[in-house]
């Protein structure tokens, strides 16, 4: 859903569609800018959610992040975005933040898995309320998350497992011939 008109307006549009949940982008999906919401906007958004019995809301992190990158600048950018977005989603009372694990860019899936899990151990906090979801990937090129085994390898290394989950994207799993 577009949040161009604000979170409350987006929630109103969801109600008009007879839906009870929504997915938004945490910020510009192809960049790094994000909107700051006034407390009144957040209160209005949460009131609409409560009044219409919304289920959990999902925010998607930008596509431009690569948590498995060997390039320090790219990796640090991704760490900053995830850290900021967890804090922001907690403030907005948005329950879930999903992200693409990234591409290992030739250094190997095992190294990509190590980088992702180390980053998650660094930024996840016991007091956070937002659950972070790893999204299944198609496995094109050097993408990490092409199999449930790769996602499991990341989750096994994360210390705060109760703050983690997997977002299963059927189309991507189908592209890799993954079976449930």
Model-derived features: positions:
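Conserved small/polar residues in nucleotide/adenosyl-binding loops
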Residues: 169-176
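N-terminal pre-domain/capping segments
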Residues: 1-61, 65, 69-84
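Hydrophobic faces of well-ordered beta-strands that scaffold small-molecule active sites
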Residues: 1, 22-24, 57-61, 97-99, ...
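Alpha-helix capping and helix-coil boundary motifs
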Residues: 6-9, 105-108, 177
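Cytosolic catalytic cores of cyclic-nucleotide second-messenger enzymes
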Residues: 180
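Active-site acidic/histidine proton-transfer and metal-coordination neighborhood
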Residues: 67-164
């Amino acid at each position: 859903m577009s949040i161009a008109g604000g979170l409350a307006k987006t929630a109103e549009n969801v109600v008009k569609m007879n839906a009870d949940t929504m997915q938004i982008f945490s910020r510009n999906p192809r960049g790094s800018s994000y909107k700051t919401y006034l407390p009144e906007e957040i209160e209005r958004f949460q009131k609409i959610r409560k009044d219409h019995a919304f289920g959990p809301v999902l925010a998607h992190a930008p596509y431009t992040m690569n948590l498995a990158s060997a390039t320090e600048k790219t990796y640090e950018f991704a760490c900053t975005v995830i850290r900021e977005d967890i804090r922001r989603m907690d403030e907005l009372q948005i329950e879930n933040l999903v992200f693409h694990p990234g591409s290992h860019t030739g250094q190997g899936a095992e190294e990509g898995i190590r980088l992702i899990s180390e980053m998650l151990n660094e930024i996840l906090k016991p007091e956070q309320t937002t659950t972070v979801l790893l999204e299944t990937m198609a496995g094109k090129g050097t993408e990490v998350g092409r199999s449930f085994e790769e996602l499991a390898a990341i989750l096994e290394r994360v210390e705060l497992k109760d703050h983690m989950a997997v977002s299963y994207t059927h189309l991507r799993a189908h592209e890799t011939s993954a079976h449930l």
